[in-house]
Swiss-Prot record:
InterPro entries: PS_antenna-like, PS_II_antenna-like_sf, PSII_PsbC, PSII_PsbC_sf. This is Photosystem II CP43 reaction center protein. Residues 1-14 form a propeptide. Its main location: plastid. It comes from the Eukaryota. GO terms for cellular component: chloroplast thylakoid membrane; photosystem II. It comes from Helianthus annuus (Common sunflower). The gene is psbC. The chain crosses the membrane at residues 69-93, 134-155, 178-200, 255-275, 291-312, 447-471.
Length: 473
C-alpha cells in the first residue's frame, strides 16, 4: 500500500499509554494512537475501518429495531402517541402505516414488522462488523481494489462521495414512491381532520421548490421550515433525489478541478471534519423542523407546536365565552386591545391577548375559520365544528413546554397533564447534538489543517506525571 505522508505528518499527535494492552498492528507503537483513540488507529487499515463502520451501523439499526419494539409493547391505542413519550411510532404513522382518519391507530402490526426487520438487519450488520474487524483482511487495497482507497487519492475520494450521493438520492426517492404508489402518507391537512392519502399532484415547479430556500428564516417566512403542504414536500424530495443522483454520477465520472484540489485539505481527518459539519447543519435544521412544522411532523402524532398550543388556548376560551354571551368581535382586553380578536399590523384579524405573537400559525383545525382578511368573524360565530373544539382543547393542555418530570404545558394551567412533548425531546436533542457535532467539526478541521501545514506536534508528554506512576497492571 502506498504510504500517504511521512508517518509524522499522518499521525500528528503523540499519545502514550500502557503498551501491554496492544493488538497487533493496532497498538500505540505502530499507529501513533492509543487504544482509546478508537478508529484513529485504523486510518491506514481500510479493512478494519470497514469493520468499525459496519459494526457502528449495526448498533444504530439495533437501537432502531429494539426501541421500535419497546414502543410497540408499551403503546396504548386509546391515548395519543405524544402522551406516551413515543418518538419512533410517530415517524411510522406519518409515513401512513397503521393509521386512519384523524390519525387514529387502526393496526399496530406494521410497527411490529418494522421493529423486527430492523433487528434482523442489525444482526447481519453486526456479523459483518465483527467479521471485518477481527477476521477479514486488514487492508482492502490488495484483494479488493474497488473497495480500497488512499486518503489523498482525490479522484477515488470524489468517486466515494458520488456513490454516497447516489445512495442518498435513492433514499429520497423511497419517500416519493411511498407517497405516490405504496399507500400514500399521512396528510394532516386532509378534510375533516387528517387522513392517509396518495399524493397525486406533485409540486415540481422550481420557482416554488427553490423559493423556499430563498425565503427569510424569520417571522412568517420561515425558510424551508415553513413548508405546509405535502405536494411541496414530496416534490422537494423528487428534486433533492434527482440532484443527489446526478451530482453523484458527476462526482464518479469527474476528477476534482484545480481550485478544489488547492482549496480543500485531502486527508482522512479533513473528510471527517467535513462530514461532522454537514451532520451539524442537518441537526440544526431538524431541530427547527420538528419544533415549528406541523405538516412534516403532524400534531396528531407529535403533539401541538408551541404556537399551536397557544393559539388553541385562545380559541378554546373564545368558544367558551361566546357561548356565555360575550361579543368576541368587540370585547376589550385589559390592555385596551381586543380581548379575543384584534388586528395584526398588516390588517389581518388575529387572536388577541398574549398569543398575538403567534398570529402567523397555520393549523388544520383553524384554517377553515379564516377568510381573505384573517379570521372571519361570521365563521367564528356560526361555523365552528365540534372536532375543532375538541382538538384545540386537547392541544391547549399539551403545550410542548416543561422539563423532565414536570407538568407539560403552561405551568399555571390547571388542566395540563404530566408529560413532556416529543417535540421537546426531538428539538432539544437535535439542537444539542448539532452543537456537539459542530464543535467536533471545529476540532477535527483544526487538526487536519494543522497536519496539512506540517506544524501539529501534539502535547509534549515527556514530563507528564503519569509517566512516573506504577503501570495499572
Amino acid at each position: 500500500m502506498k504510504t500517504l505522508y511521512s508517518l509524522r505528518r499522518f499521525y500528528p499527535v503523540e499519545t502514550l499509554f500502557n503498551g501491554t494492552l496492544a493488538l497487533a498492528g493496532r497498538d500505540q507503537e505502530t499507529t501513533g494512537f492509543a487504544w482509546w483513540a478508537g478508529n484513529a488507529r485504523l486510518i491506514n487499515l481500510s479493512g478494519k475501518l470497514l469493520g468499525a463502520h459496519v459494526a457502528h451501523a449495526g448498533l444504530i439499526v439495533f437501537w432502531a429495531g429494539a426501541m421500535n419494539l419497546f414502543e410497540v409493547a408499551h403503546f396504548v391505542p386509546e391515548k395519543p402517541m405524544y402522551e406516551q413519550g413515543l418518538i419512533l411510532l410517530p415517524h411510522l404513522a406519518t409515513l401512513g402505516w397503521g393509521v386512519g382518519p384523524g390519525g387514529e391507530v387502526i393496526d399496530t402490526f406494521p410497527y411490529f414488522v418494522s421493529g423486527v426487520l430492523h433487528l434482523i438487519s442489525s444482526a447481519v450488520l453486526g456479523f459483518g462488523g465483527i467479521y471485518h474487524a477481527l477476521l477479514g483482511p486488514e487492508t482492502l487495497e490488495e484483494s479488493f481494489p474497488f473497495f480500497g482507497y488512499v486518503w489523498k487519492d482525490r479522484n477515488k475520494m470524489t468517486t466515494i462521495l458520488g456513490i454516497h450521493l447516489i445512495l442518498l438520492g435513492l433514499g429520497a426517492f423511497l419517500l416519493v414512491f411511498k407517497a405516490l404508489y405504496f399507500g400514500g402518507v399521512y396528510d394532516t391537512w386532509a378534510p375533516g381532520g387528517g387522513d392517509v392519502r396518495k399524493i397525486t399532484n406533485l409540486t415540481l415547479s422550481p420557482s416554488i421548490i427553490f423559493g423556499y430556500l430563498l425565503k427569510s428564516p424569520f417571522g412568517g417566512e420561515g425558510w424551508i421550515v415553513s413548508v405546509d403542504d405535502l405536494e411541496d414536500i414530496i416534490g422537494g424530495h423528487v428534486w433533492l433525489g434527482s440532484i443527489c443522483i446526478l451530482g453523484g454520477i458527476w462526482h464518479i465520472l469527474t476528477k476534482p478541478f484545480a481550485w478544489a484540489r488547492r482549496a480543500l485539505v485531502w486527508s482522512g481527518e479533513a473528510y471527517l471534519s467535513y462530514s461532522l459539519a454537514a451532520i451539524s447543519v442537518f441537526g440544526f435544521i431538524a431541530c427547527c423542523f420538528v419544533w415549528f412544522n406541523n405538516t412534516a411532523y403532524p400534531s396528531e402524532f407529535y403533539g401541538p407546536t408551541g404556537p399551536e398550543a397557544s393559539q388553541a388556548q385562545a380559541f378554546t376560551f373564545l368558544v367558551r365565552d361566546q357561548r356565555l354571551g360575550a361579543n368576541v368581535g368587540s370585547a376589550q382586553g385589559p390592555t385596551g386591545l381586543g380581548k379575543y380578536l384584534m388586528r395584526s399590523p398588516t390588517g389581518e384579524v388575529i387572536f388577541g391577548g398574549e398569543t398575538m405573537r403567534f398570529w402567523d400559525l397555520r393549523a388544520p383545525w383553524l384554517e377553515p375559520l379564516r377568510g381573505p382578511n384573517g379570521l372571519d368573524l361570521s365563521r367564528l360565530k356560526k361555523d365552528i365544528q365540534p372536532w375543532q373544539e375538541r382538538r384545540s382543547a386537547e392541544y391547549m393542555t399539551h403545550a410542548p413546554l416543561g422539563s423532565l418530570n414536570s407538568v407539560g404545558g403552561v405551568a399555571t394551567e390547571i388542566n395540563a397533564v404530566n408529560y413532556v412533548s416529543p417535540r421537546s425531546w426531538l428539538a432539544t436533542s437535535h439542537f444539542v447534538l448539532g452543537f456537539f457535532f459542530f464543535v467536533g467539526h471545529l476540532w477535527h478541521a483544526g487538526r487536519a489543517r494543522a497536519a496539512a501545514a506540517g506544524f501539529e506536534k501534539g502535547i509534549d508528554r515527556d514530563f507528564e506525571p503519569v509517566l512516573s506512576m506504577t503501570p495499572l497492571n
